[in-house]
Amino acid sequence: MKKLLFKLFFALAFTSISLHGQEKIQQVEFSSFGGRALYSRHYTINFLYKEFEAKQVMGEPAELPKKILQLNPPDKWRVFTKKINLDKFKKLRDGPSEQTVDGQDEVIIIKTDKKTYRKMNAYSNDHDREVWYDLLQIIAKEFGKKGIYE
C-alpha cells in the first residue's frame, strides 16, 4: 500500500511539474516594413481580438484597409495556438536585414505568459524557412487570406 501511495505521489508531482513548465501563448504578431514597399503591415492576434493595420510609407495616396479589428472567440484562439509549435519557433535563427538591398524586413513576435520571442527574417535555411512560412500561413488563415502576402 505504501508503495502504491509513493508511486501515486510521484506521478502527480511529475505531472504537475510538466504542466506548470509549459508556456502559454498570449499573443502573436507579424510585421513587415522597410525597403521599397508602399506600406507597412502589422498583424496582431491574441485571445481577445485579431487586428490588421496598414500604414502607407511612400508613393501616391492609396486606398488601403487602414485597420481591421475583429473579436476573437476563445474556441478559435485555442485552435489557433495549438497549431503553433513554440519549440520550433524558439530555435529559429534571425536572418540579415533585407533593407540593405531595398527589401522588406519581416518580424514575428510570440508573447507567452513567461517570455517574449522575436524573430526577424528567420528563413535562411530549409528547416527555418519551412517553420517560418508555416507560421505565416497560420496567421494569414486567421484573417481569411490564402497567404500573408495577399
Language model regions located:
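Bacterial Sec-dependent N-terminal signal peptides
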Residues: 1-24
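Short, well-ordered, aromatic-rich surface patches in folded extracellular/luminal domains
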Residues: 5, 21-35, 81, 90-150
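N-terminal export/targeting and maturation segments
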Residues: 19-56
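Short, surface-exposed coil-to-beta transition loops
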Residues: 37-42, 64, 102-105
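Short beta-strand segments
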Residues: 41-43, 65-67, 115-120
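Short, low-complexity, polar/charged sequence segments that are solvent-exposed and flexible
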Residues: 46-52, 64, 73-74, 90, ...
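A short, structured loop/turn motif at beta-sheet edges
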Residues: 47, 70-79, 110-116
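A short-motif feature that recognizes glycine-rich, charge-decorated loops
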Residues: 55-90
